[in-house]
């Protein structure tokens, strides 16, 4: 075993005074996090339409960046022994986004129930303002070493997730 210290997430500005340590985390959030992507040739099929699998990559990027914006670096989270795989995915495709257009990817952690994180998703075409994809993605915290669902999120992660409610 290595003597090097285990990685840690930075402490939440709320500090150790947060009551999350003693209770299960359950929350509902209303804030949307957004990133923009200009559609490149590698995002599309031969017809210049965004390939459906690309949307999943964009949504994951937006979730990871949303977590990073509140102090949860995904790589550090995994090093701490907590991974967040997708366990449920439901997307509805409304219309295509095409090569050269800009996609606005919006994610919102809608609900937190213990170790289950439910995300609402929207992808909108910037040029038209029309929704192209909507859906819901559910993540569950697991211990990757054991391959089992965790009983609760690490307290420091819970504290950071509460920032999404503010």
Swiss-Prot record:
GO terms for molecular function: fatty acyl-CoA hydrolase activity. Keywords: Hydrolase. The active site is at residue 45. Its EC number is 3.1.-.-. InterPro entries: 4-hydroxybenzoyl-CoA_TE, HB-CoA_thioesterase_AS, HotDog_dom_sf, YbgC/YbaW. Pfam families: 4HBT_2. Disulfide bonds: none annotated. This is Putative esterase sll0410. It comes from Synechocystis sp. (strain ATCC 27184 / PCC 6803 / Kazusa).
